[in-house]
A protein has these predicted regions:
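Eukaryote-specific intrinsically disordered, low-complexity regulatory regions enriched
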Residues: 1-188
Length: 188
């Protein structure tokens, strides 16, 4: 395990949340989501977000779980945008932005503090078990990003197929399962 990640995960995360860089990342997150909702060009905020993230990581050390956390949260933007558009909550004034921020970061904090998930992810990466990591990522995406019953039903069939293919010893079946998994990760 990464030094400190197992014994002091929550403490480090809370300390990081109080830092100036984390506040800047929060603001950029919100602005990127607002850009997404309004259909604005988000390239500037997108690049700035990763600049700040890189700077942050060089300060606190090589905590891979923070990279994964921010990358996964960044992937959630489209889902948040869809939900807000469906509920006609396009942010226009500060009140709407505050509501968006509360909704967005309540979810962020819950995800960040899910130590078991990050412990698994870190172990997958450190043991170079990429197939297992990708498969686990797909399960997480299904559970978190796509809670609708119809989508779950469709994807559960894919998961069963992947589970079968990825457990085979045949290199060809393993390769097939990996290709399907990659395709679904990119698609969704």
């Amino acid at each position: 395990m990464i030094q400190g990640a197992q014994t002091d995960f929550i403490h480090i995360l809370k300390k990081y949340k109080k830092s100036k860089r984390y506040s800047e990342l929060q603001e950029l997150h919100i602005q990127c989501v607002v850009d997404e909702l309004k259909g604005n060009n988000k390239e500037e905020h997108f690049h700035k977000f990763f600049e700040v993230l890189q700077s942050s990581l060089s300060t606190i050390g090589s905590f891979k779980f923070l990279v994964l956390c921010h990358k996964l949260i960044y992937q959630l933007q489209q889902e948040f945008a869809i939900r807000f558009i469906q509920n006609k909550l396009i942010p226009g004034d500060d009140t709407d932005k505050s509501r968006l921020a509360i909704y967005y970061y309540n979810f962020l904090f819950k995800l960040c503090e899910n130590f078991d998930y990050y412990k698994e992810v870190i172990e997958f990466i450190e043991t170079d078990n990429i197939e297992k990591f990708m498969k686990y990522e797909l399960f997480v995406q299904i559970q978190i990003l796509y809670p609708l019953a119809q989508i779950l039903q469709e994807l559960s069939q894919v998961v069963k197929l992947l589970d079968y293919l990825l457990c085979r010893e045949s290199p060809l079946l393993l390769q097939l399962g990996t290709c399907i998994l990659k395709d679904f990760c990119y698609t969704f």
